[in-house]
UniProtKB/Swiss-Prot annotation:
Protein's UniProt name: Testis-specific Y-encoded protein 1
GO molecular function: chromatin binding; histone binding
Primary localization class, coarse: cytoplasm
Originating organism: Bos taurus
Protein localization: Cytoplasm; Nucleus
InterPro entries named in the record: NAP-like_sf, NAP_family
Composition bias type Basic and acidic residues, residue spans: 15-26, 95-112
Tissue: Testis. Probably in spermatogonia.
Job description of the protein: May be involved in sperm differentiation and proliferation.
Coiled-coil annotated spans: none
Family recorded in the similarity comment: Belongs to the nucleosome assembly protein (NAP) family.
Any single Gene Ontology cellular-component annotation: cytoplasm
Taxon lineage: Eukaryota, Metazoa, Chordata, Craniata, Vertebrata
PTM annotation: Phosphorylated.
């Protein structure tokens, strides 16, 4: 690369020497040497020519010719350093330009893939299809729920009619419920002589199950006048959950005085679990199990246990 300032110091040196000689002969003062100050480069990228704006600053003291020559050489070195620095800057700019273009291209490609790329369009289509299918499933589930509720309502009404008719028929069979209860194999082992006597006063049994949470079961026993207690109705209520039956409450039994505090032969035997003790409280270890047997076995099919001792001739016919 050509260096435009290579010859400048030589010409400046000769012209400065002639000027000093001429002024010395004329008797005038010789101005001091000038220091050249580079103010700013004018760089044109990709071209070798480099222009500088140079200002001359006049010094107050005269220098020798050797000093002037030194200044010229310093200026030459300074110009060479500036040219080399400009070349390095230009090279760095050329190196940075391809990397910047590559980076811009990468960002551009990523921007094109994100908003409207094939993968995103596929995912959007799949989500739309899934949403449409979910609407259909929700609608079908709601229809099934309504159909189930309607079926259960109809089934409950039909069962209620059947139970009412069954109760009417059982009223014509004296001691039906007492015999059905005492004939169950798991209850029969608890029945005492006293139980057999007081169950003879039992008129009716009803079981009410509430399925809405919390699920509950009510056992309603109806009695005619008897020598044991004043109650005509005794209700035992239980909670129903995954663990089985759990006692909730029971109607307090109003015993006759002679049965509770009278002669020992008439007193209620509270030392063991029997049906009368179960009916009057929830303290027995098998209290919940007895409630489950009556509610799910005896109530669902009382005729099965009523005929247990007499055989199955009625069913066979």
């Amino acid at each position: 690369m050509s260096r435009p300032f290579a010859s400048a110091p030589a010409r400046g040196h000769r012209q400065g020497q002639e000027e000093r000689e001429r002024r010395s002969e004329e008797g005038g003062s010789v101005p001091g040497p000038r220091t050249f100050q580079v103010v700013s480069p004018v760089v044109t990228p990709g071209q070798e020519a480099t222009l500088f704006r140079v200002e001359a600053v006049e010094e107050g003291e005269a220098r020798h010719e050797g000093d002037v020559a030194g200044i010229g050489r310093e200026f030459q070195l300074l110009a060479e350093d500036i040219v080399e620095e400009v070349e390095v800057v230009a090279d760095e700019e050329q190196e940075q330009r391809p990397s910047q273009e590559l980076e811009e291209k990468t960002v551009e490609e990523q921007g094109q893939e994100r908003p409207g790329g094939p993968c995103e369009r596929q995912e959007l289509d799949a989500l739309q299809a899934l949403a449409a299918l979910q609407v259909e499933l929700s609608s079908e589930r709601e229809q099934n729920r309504r159909a189930y509720v309607q079926f259960m309502r109809k089934n409950h009404q039909r069962r209620k009619r059947h139970l009412a008719r069954r109760s009417t028929i059982i009223q014509g069979i004296p001691g039906f419920w007492a015999k059905a209860i005492m004939s169950h194999p798991q209850v029969s082992v608890l029945i005492s002589d006293q139980d057999q006597d007081f169950l003879g006063y039992m008129m009716d049994l009803k079981v009410q199950v509430r399925s809405h949470p919390p699920s509950r079961c009510k056992l309603i026993f109806s009695f005619r006048d008897n020598p044991y207690f004043l109650n005509s109705v005794i209700i035992k209520e239980y909670y129903l959950d995954i663990t089985g039956y759990r006692a909730r409450r029971s109607t307090p039994v109003h015993w006759f005085w002679d049965f509770e505090r009278g002669a020992p032969s008439r007193r209620r035997d509270t030392r063991s679990l029997n049906f009368l003790n179960w009916l009057s409280g929830h303290n027995g270890p098998e209290s919940n199990r007895i409630a489950e047997i009556i509610s799910e076995d005896v109530w669902d099919d009382p005729l099965k246990y009523y005929l247990r001792e007499e055989g199955s001739s009625v069913r066979d016919n």
